[in-house]
Amino acid sequence: MSFLNSFRFNPNPSGDTSFIARAQQKSAPGIKVNVSALGANESQQSFGEDLAKYNIQPVWLSIENETDEQLVFPPITMDPDYYSSYEVSYRFHGTLSFAANRARDEFFLKRQMANILPPHSRTTGFVYGVLDAGVKYAHIVLAGNSRVETFDFVLPVPGPPFVGTNIRANNFYPDKNIEDLELGSLRTTFAKQTCCTTNSGGTRDGDPLNLVIVEARQDPLVPFIARGWHLARRLDVASAIETARAFLFRNAFLTSPVSPLYVFGRREDLALQKARSTIKERVHARLWLTPYAFEGRRVWIGQVSRDIGVRLTGQTWNLTTHKIAPDIDFDRAYLLQDLLMSGFVERYGYMAGVGAAPASAPRTNLTGDSYYTDGLRAIVFLSNQTTPFGAIERLPWEVPAPPSEEAR
């Protein structure tokens, strides 16, 4: 069948309106940038080939340059592993299908995004990037002789359901005003929040809530996705089967689901993870939107921990769960470092709230894994623009305890 298909090349760009309509737009004086990431079905229809099969994801761009100077768009800033048009088209070449091969080459080349943007022009095209699921991060740089502009996007990708997209406070708190806090009351309010996540009934404590994030005006996912975090799939039959398959064959599953935990009577609003090359190992974070704001910016509370293995359990419907590393302060520090390295942090600090649990008297989570902690929560204030590492403010609040001798 693949031999016969190599003689056929029937792209259908008539359906491009679906991804163009959901394109995100950002602008600077004299410049407008529209971007959209294609899902697997959209790219197959538009390009006539199953690009997702080869881990390729086209990203559509439309850039209006109304300035008086030429701008340069380097695609490598958007995706360091992007493909050339010929690299993509050659994957679908047939041995004897000369006419179809030539048509593929010309079609993919014609649609490739140009990197030179003349003054007073509108340029459209595609960057052939590496496949991402759930969301795709795009860092776009436009450079001229007298200016450099950067734009950061977190683009939704059509496909299976993920935990945490388009979250609105009024969906969770329709009858309650969001309380806007100043810095001092932010500290005291979140130091008094419940120590831990719970089960669905709120009768048992789970993993500790060791993280507070104050978002910026832009999408709070930007610093996470920029550092290689992925949204987690929603836990359902399909994702459970894929998880089991990855476990049995020792494969990676970058978007594997997380077990639901509860705060404010609901499961996590957002679940992110940074996985290794095996399903058994990952750092993951769950976040809940709170009924509080800081200077008009939404505030989240969450937990971060590190999975170091997978084991069977009778406490989950899919009979498997991850085992967490007991030193959760290490993982709190890892996430903080990762966000600092993204550049999208303006200040950070630590506050009370969890309650200390030494290694000699650890607590357990809902699946029986032990953990110990100094009892602090990290608080991170995100920013819209990148901040040099040395210019990031550290709040003079609590100080994390050094690792105890008994835990070494």
What are these regions (language model features)?
Residues 57, 235-404:
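A cross-kingdom signal targeting lumenal/periplasmic-facing segments of multi-pass membrane
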Residues 3-9, 81, 111-174:
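Surface-exposed edge beta-strand/loop patches
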